[in-house]
Every structure is written in structure tokens, then in C-alpha cells.
């Protein structure tokens, strides 16, 4: 039996009770009447943008000589059309001891620079909240080079402060897990521990 999918300029329509229920779990507090049978949602996803460059970025990661080269190459590659690839939290290190983090995600700007740049349900009856064709540059996304604390960890958690000018997404809810990872690493550092691969697996 063929599956009929309705498409809009924003993306496919989500109309099934199951999909609406799952959307309600994530976005239920943001709009009224989420479970109304007459409501359909168009689902926009930056990862569906044309011109995926994921493989090119993976190659860049593999051949970069150091952290600075990798970061500058990424900026150059995305200067014109923005980052168009799989969403990723990229953590890197080089032989000189430099470390860095870059959030890489195809995040489109909205008209009038509204703060709703992440996963939010908005009124689709108007084009007011539509994306523009511009992707937010990597330099405006969360990043760090040689942070003062001396290490970088990530557990798909929120990387931006609460007063950040942009909404970086509703799905990065693992902050508690990340805090615990940081605690365990700090405890090891304070005790003079030399971490091994097995230690990282245990954490």
C-alpha cells in the first residue's frame, strides 16, 4: 500500500496521531491544542538542505595538520553557503596539545532575526516565521579553542549559556549527564590521575 506524504515549502506535513503525540511530548508546552485532530504540522529540518558536504568535512578532519588548520578550513568551506552536513558536536585535538570544540549544524536564519532558530512550533499560516536561504555561520555557533578548564566534553548537551542570543535547539537536554562527566574528569585531574582509554569508556 503506497504511503502518501503531503509536502509544503517548509517540509512534510505531520498529521498522524502517533506523530502528533510524539511532537506533543517534545513541544507540548509551546502551542495550544497540539492534539487537535484538525491540526497538521509542517516539519522543517536543516539537515534536508541540498548540497550536503558531510563527506568533505570528514575528509578535512582526516587531513588537517592541527586544530587551527581544521577550524580555519571549516570556516573557509562554509563562508559562502554555510555548513550543509550532518549535525555534529566536533571535538578535536592535535599533537601540540591544542583542543577545540565546534558545534556544526545547518541552522537557517529566520526573517527579521527572530529568536526562534531552533526546534519550536510556530504559526504556519503565515510566512512570518519562515527560514531565509542563509545558514548561520559556524563562527556564530558554540565553539571553544583551548578552554581555560583544560578539557572539553560533550554529551549532546546545551553548549550555550542561558542568555545566548540564539535558540540552539530543543533536543539538547543531556546537560545533567554532561555535568556529571565534567565532575568525574575534574576529580581525576585534581587527584593527579593520568586518564586512559579504559577510563574514558568507564566514564
Regions found by a protein language model. Name each.
Residues 1-203:
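Mature extracytoplasmic enzyme cores
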